[in-house]
Regions:
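C-terminal interaction-tip segments
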Residues: 1-25, 30, 34, 93-107
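A generic structural signal for short beta-strands and their flanking turns/coil linkers
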Residues: 25-27, 37-39, 88
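Low-complexity intrinsically disordered segments
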Residues: 12, 22, 42-45, 50, ...
Length: 107
């Protein structure tokens, strides 16, 4: 059975590594974050962030922008189509001081 993968987004310039436990196709990336500073959040199969690259390579699955609005939380529900294998790593990269949040990947 496919399982969801929940990971905290640390905020600032950071990367979260999510190790996949079984082969499946991830179809949804739900992200919530505190909108504390301008920045970006990126879902990728590469351990190297491509935030700041205008035309990233195909390892970047999705990218979100965060404005400098300090009034609360933002959420995004992004449809994706990402086949993954057991023990493969998927990465969530972020920039923006204080953009703490949660990433949920699911089938």
């Amino acid at each position: 059975m496919a399982r969801p993968y929940v990971a905290d987004i640390a905020g600032g310039t950071a990367t979260v590594t999510i190790q996949i436990q079984a082969s499946q196709t991830l179809r949804r990336w739900f992200v919530s974050w505190m909108n504390a500073a301008a920045g970006k959040i990126e879902l990728s199969t590469s351990p190297t962030s491509q935030i700041g690259t205008a035309q990233p390579d195909p390892s970047v699955i999705a990218r979100l922008s965060s404005g400098a609005n300090t009034t609360g939380q933002a959420v995004a529900d992004v449809p994706i189509n990402l086949p993954v294998k057991a023990f493969q790593n998927v990465y969530v990269h972020c920039t923006g001081a204080g953009n703490l949040g949660t990433s949920i990947l699911s089938s």
